[in-house]
Amino acid sequence: MPEDRVDRRLAAIFAADIAGYSRLMGVDEEGTLRQLKAHRKELVNPKITEHRGRIVKTTGDGMLVEFVSVVDAVRCAVDIQRGMAERTSDLPAEKRIEFRVGINVGDIISDTNDIYGDGVNVAARLEALAEPGGIMVSRTVHDQVRDKLSFGFKDMGEQPVKNIARPIGVYQVSLIENT
């Protein structure tokens, strides 16, 4: 294989960050960090493993995760958001750690330590559109999972997103299962 060959593949990309992280750290750095580490160890990382995801990288308040299956990516996000809501329900709203999640499917460029490409950028922009505790997915994700999962989706229409040339079709995922 030539040295300059680029490793490309189709993947489901899950981007997450903590809403209000700087505020939480400003109020209680040690407590926030302790809670975050516990949430990752006891809930987030096990759910990612359970749903066959690969953590590409973490930042202080976020993470980028790659999945082979978009169904697994959405199920993982729902499990994490439900679990976080349960784990923090007894805390005042201003002390809760709440993730925002964006999921996209796209062609990515991969190297040993990171993933790149428009698919990754769109996932990050979807995450920025999500409410704290919420999940936003692209139309491509919705089209792949709508008949395979029992969660509801709300069409948020075409949304312009920063540094992406075209508007993105966006859907909000309901954490309540359809009956």
Region locations from a protein language model:
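Catalytic NTP-binding/metal-coordinating core of nucleotidyl cyclase/transferase enzymes
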Residues: 1-83
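Catalytic beta-strand-to-alpha-helix segment of the class III nucleotidyl cyclase homology domain
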Residues: 4, 45, 64-178
